[in-house]
Amino acid sequence: MNKVFPNAAAACHDIHDGATLLVGGFGLCGVPNECIAAVRDLGAKNLTVVSNNAGTSTSGLVHLLNNRQVKKMMSSYVGENVVFEKQMLSGEIEVELIPQGTLSERIRAGGAGIPAFFTPTGVGTLVAEGKEVREFGGRRYVMERGITGEFALVRAFRGDRFGNLVFRKTSRN
C-alpha cells in the first residue's frame, strides 16, 4: 500500500464530521500546519482534537477553532491561543485538560490496545473528579482511559510509501 499523497488535502480527504484527530506538535515545533489548513478547507466539523496544546492565536489549531470546527479539545495546556481560551471560558467548546505525561500515556495506551491504566498523577485534584480511584501498595491511583483517534496529523521531514517517517531537530517530539 502506497501511503504517499500528493498534498495535504489528499491526505486529509477522508476526515469527516465528528472525527477524532490526534495532532502532533509542541508549541510552535512540529505542528502539521498544512494538514490543519487542509482540514479547515475540508470543512469537517464537530471534531474532537487531541493535542498537547492549541498552538497560538495565529498558527496551528487556531484555524479550526476560528471556524468553530472543534467540538472538544483534549489538551495539557491552554497556552497562548486567545481564541481557544475564549471558547473554553465561554463554554463554547468542551475542554478536557490532562497532565502532559498522562496525555502521552493515554495516547500510547490507546494505540497499544490498552483500554485503561492507573496513575498517581492527579489523585486528589480536579483531574481525578468523577474517575475511579484505587489503592495499590498503600498509594492511591486514578484510572485513566486510553485515547484512540481516527486520524493522526503529524509533521515529518521525510516519509516513504510504507508510512515510515523521519523527524528532525526540535520536531522530534
Task: Show which residues each predicted segment covers.
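Conserved alpha/beta enzyme-core scaffold
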Residues: M1-N173
